[in-house]
Amino acid sequence: MRSFIAATIAAAASATLMNGEDYAFIQYVAEHAKSYGTVEEFNFRKANFLAAHAEIAAFNSATQTIGHNVFSDWSADEFKKLLGYRAQDRIPSQSTFTPPKSNAAVVDWRSAGAVTPVKDQKACGSCWSFSTTGALEGAHFIASGELLSLSEQQLMDCSWKFGNLSCGGGLMDSAFNYAKTTPITTEAQYPYTAMFHTSCGYVAGTGKVQVSSYYDVTLNSAQALKDAIALGPVSVAIQANEPAFQYYTSGIITSGCGTSLDHGVLAVGYGSENGVEYTIVKNSWGPSWGESGYVRIGVAEGAGICGINSSASQPQTN
């Protein structure tokens, strides 16, 4: 059947008469090396793509661009399963902290060597675990000068009793609480599978980084988030279930997303462009998404653009 679909695509691509939408879909399939096993799936994916195509065409922003990416043939339900930040379960930490005011105009922890390469959570709602490991990787580097890629799968498999649900979602603060009790091992030692596991595979003695404490950044304060970022990468939650984020390709998001938090990411810096301030955010959808796996989100007081000021936390490590 795959050969039938391939032949169908090849025939369509060579046809002299093809409407613009059909041609756009064929180009998309080729560019993203998509493969559909049945005629029914082909038609389903095409319908999803055409819906995305309409949203992208209707989008208008002076500060950012959006375009087709790996998610353009996904259904809305499939995409929502990626968004695993369980805002309804969050209990604010008893420890809050207002960092000293930062006077630095630009901070970028990538250039300092504190950020690992962009990872890919795949079709699993494990964003919270990637946000957690990113914050721990940064804190450990700042404390020791050693950059380690830490295991998201350990957090997924082993922090159930702290309220996390693997691919079903979780919270960064809950993962920090787990990492107080058990050090986190490396990605190489405990590789990512993007799957539910009912048992914990952590091997005692292999842990590398343990949380000594963590704090929640002052709520709804753009300045407090900026000051925290100046100290190191910060786990943040945002609303990602909007075309402005799903199909983001470049620029600064200044509108088009709400504040209903559903996705855990990592703030790794800040700066400004043409007078527009932004936060540099590392996503976990692979390096082909956005600006090489990153997104710049505009700065605003209150909950912030995409809710970025609403649920930020930062760990310290042993």
For the regions a language model picked out, list residue spans one by one.
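Catalytic-core signature of thiol
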Residues: 4, 14-318
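Classical eukaryotic N-terminal signal peptides for Sec-dependent ER targeting/secretion
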Residues: 1-10
